[in-house]
Amino acid sequence: MNITTAPGLIGRSTQAITPGYMSGFGNSFETEALPGALPIGRNSPQRAPYGLYAEQLSGSPFTAPRGSNERSWLYRIRPSVQHSGRFEKAEAGLWRSAPCHEHDMPIAQLRWDPPPLPQRAQTFLQGVETMTTAGDVNTQAGMAAHMYLISASMVNQHFYNADGELMFVPQQGGLRLVTEFGVIGVAPGEIAVIPRGVKFRVELIDGPARGYLCENYGGGFTLPERGPIGANCLANARDFLTPVAAYEDSDTPTELYVKWGGALWVTQLPHSPIDVVAWHGNYAPYKYDLRTFSPVGAIGFDHPDPSIFTVLTSPSETAGTANIDFVIFPERWMVAENTFRPPWYHMNIMSEFMGLIYGVYDAKPQGFLPGGASLHNMMLPHGPDREAFDHASNAELKPVKLEGTLAFMFETRYPQRVTVHAATSSTLQADYAECWRGLQKRFDPTKP
């Protein structure tokens, strides 16, 4: 193995790093697709190796505290400024941004069936369908919950989102996310997060794909504090994977789409923007297998708050009040004694958008299907349907393993407003509230 050195600088291997992933969350990573492509001991040398351009991508202000300062240095074949002419407005389809007041639907608990896969060729940019928006994209607060329906890979098209980071939650079909930092493969049961400003394209792996997409306008997702839980369990940092460098040296013209200020814009590039040969820093895309989440729960009695299932959180300026919490309900043992084990009836200051990746959700055994969604907005009551209540109220309280299920929730401090598309969709269940109508009056003052 050859080692290059310079006066006063630490030597570094010139052997190319093996393709794949690097483990860890929020690490200061470094990776090179060609040996020696990373400058040693400095970020912006007079002449970068291989004739590359040094470019910094900042995910936080320069003066952010060290613990929350995010940036990466990219060493690329051409700088990002090299695009052709001005950006022009592009058709955004069904993609909407907050604030979105296009529909004044009466407040209600809502649930949708899974949307059908497209019958025509439809790329990622054509297949995003916004369900709800919350907050304000212009103040960098809030989120949008989308579905994506894809039947064709992006060819000679690339995209980045200046409005927020994107969390992909596949439900059917795998995706290949070709980013300027490297390649991420993501399948149902996994998530992938693409930070604000990172260029990428979406390719299909095994046929048409359907899934959920969270657009986070606020602070980047991070691991929640564990508090008294301690140093282990929930989502462990070692299970997050960031791609190693991979690049394309292609002079084929491509379209570059940018979401900025709630609108979609497009310009032309004379080359592929996936041309980063090496990079280092802590601002990068990543993936996570939700099945590595280590849940904690009640081992005596009662049902704890769903916050114990938080995978990632986007904090707000108010401690303990999230811009977004990403929560999952995975396989787990239920052992609590003398306890109603499903989630209890609830009214919440937070607004909850839920999806089901596979299996059956224990509080809604009927009607909530994989690929479907529900919305329980702030201070609107929700909880188990009659079937779940009757079963859990009379079940033998032996240890039970909840298997073959994976549901999730995007929970935000902001009210979620429903788009016209979501409010008028044929998948909207008109009879959702009927699932609670059968709950009987059980009160008897003579029987404590």
Swiss-Prot record:
Its cofactor is Fe cation. SUPFAM superfamilies: RmlC-like cupins (SSF51182). The active site is at residue 303. Pfam families: HgmA_C (PF04209), HgmA_N (PF20510). One of its GO terms (biological process) is L-phenylalanine catabolic process. Belongs to the homogentisate dioxygenase family. Hexamer; dimer of trimers. This is Homogentisate 1,2-dioxygenase. The lineage of its organism: Bacteria, Pseudomonadati, Pseudomonadota, Alphaproteobacteria, Hyphomicrobiales. The gene is hmgA.
